[in-house]
Design a protein with these regions (language model features):
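Flexible, acidic/Gly-rich N-terminal and inter-domain linker regions that tether
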Residues: 1-130
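Conserved Radical SAM active-site core
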Residues: 98, 111-138, 148-195
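Cys/His-enriched microdomains
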Residues: 141-145
């Protein structure tokens, strides 16, 4: 009691189990720019990363999942390497980022694109003001990874087979109206910045 909290981080080179990154050193692998540049964003990217680990059944199941989901895929090598590919059907990380066609269930009849009704309370193109002292500022639409169940899949990650998306692409010059709105609402005390 009373001492600093410590965490036992995994110091192993776990990514070496993925054929594409077998020869990547820890300094390179730990570089966030390298992670972004080498993100897996397609079926060919999955095949390239996994090589012999990618069975045709796995690839077909992921392809079937991508035909049903409104979100594209984007996984950094770090996240991709954390998936236990020997038991991919049940892996919780895979479930979060890579949908399988075999695991889809029908949508609820009242499913909505904007399930959190953020657009209803939009004060500016990039600011949702729902509560008197709180607002949500969405300055960008790029995430380092794309979660398959993202509540903003209607605007993030580009169009898919089942969802056509307009180019949201927030730009800094478009933020002026948001900053002006915030300045004109001194009751706002808490601004959540998200993507």
């Amino acid at each position: 009691g009373g001492g600093p909290l410590t965490y036992d981080f995994d110091r192993s080179e776990f990514w070496r189990s993925i054929p594409l990154w077998r020869n990547v050193d820890s300094k390179t692998f730990g570089d966030f720019r390298w992670q972004q540049r080498n993100s897996v964003t397609s079926i060919p990217g999955i095949k390239e990363a996994l090589c012999e680990l990618a069975s045709s059944a796995l690839i077909s199941d992921i392809e079937a999942g991508l035909l049903k989901t409104p979100m594209n895929i984007r996984l950094t090598p770090y996240i991709f390497s954390r998936i236990h590919w020997e038991n991919f059907e049940n892996d919780p990380i895979r479930r979060q980022f890579l949908p399988l066609g075999s695991q889809f269930v029908p949508d609820h009849p009242q499913v909505m694109d904007d399930s959190l009704a953020e657009d209803v309370d939009k004060a500016t193109p990039h600011l949702t003001h729902r509560y008197p002292d709180k607002a949500l500022f969405l300055p960008i639409t790029l995430c380092p990874v794309y979660c398959s169940f993202c509540t903003r899949s209607r605007v993030v990650g580009g169009s898919t087979a089942v969802k056509s998306k307009s180019a949201y692409g927030a730009k800094s010059k478009e933020w002026d109206s948001t900053f002006e709105y915030i300045r004109n609402h001194p009751d706002l005390e808490d601004i959540v910045i998200s993507g």
